[in-house]
Amino acid sequence: MPRSYNSEKRKQLENELRQKIVEATVALHAEKGVTSTSYQDIAKRADVAIPTVYKKFPDASGLLYACTRHAAMRAPVQSEEIFTGKTSLRQRVAALVHTRCKVHAYFNPWLKWGGDRVMPEVISLLKEDITQTKRLILAAFAPAYATGKIPKELLSMSLLLLNYHTWASLQAQGKITQKQIEMYITNSICKLI
């Protein structure tokens, strides 16, 4: 008697296989960078055949898109909820800085590979991050700028101070703690206001 076909089970197995490949790729991108990771590396890490990786992701663009989304879904949450209970401008700025530093620490394994940042899929994610950061800056500064009209220079300088590269350069010094980095950035932003 022929075995019955279960399309739901098949679909589940396909999704699990795809997820396994994405997770292997995300880990390799953190270890080696996007441009140094081959489909052969991915197949070995995922414990699948190389053609299986190509079948699931015929082009690197689709794989990179899946990986950036996978990593982004697990990133620390950046929402206006971080300001709950924060009444002073300094408290709000400190909450924003703390959140941004957590995000930078989370994404550092991938972003440290500078050449990878020129890829369209990564650029798209970074643009989304800038938009989100701008929203949070506006929310943080709301007590000081009730109209929501923050001076352009203040917004630009705040974006610069909250940028991954600022965090990474301070982190690279190695002699200051995460808490000190957060204090430095918070103080710098508060002096601009």
Where do the model's predicted regions map?
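Generic hydrophobic, amphipathic alpha-helix propensity
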Residues: 13-25, 42, 67-71, 75
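Amphipathic alpha-helical packing segments from all-alpha helical-bundle domains
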Residues: 98, 102, 106-109, 120-156, ...
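Alpha-helical DNA-contacting segments of helix-turn-helix folds
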Residues: 64-71, 114, 129
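N-terminal intrinsically disordered/low-complexity leader segments
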Residues: 1-15
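Hydrophobic alpha-helical connector segments
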Residues: 66, 79-106
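Helix-turn-helix
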Residues: 20, 28-62, 66
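Amphipathic C-terminal alpha-helical segment
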Residues: 139, 155-176, 191-193
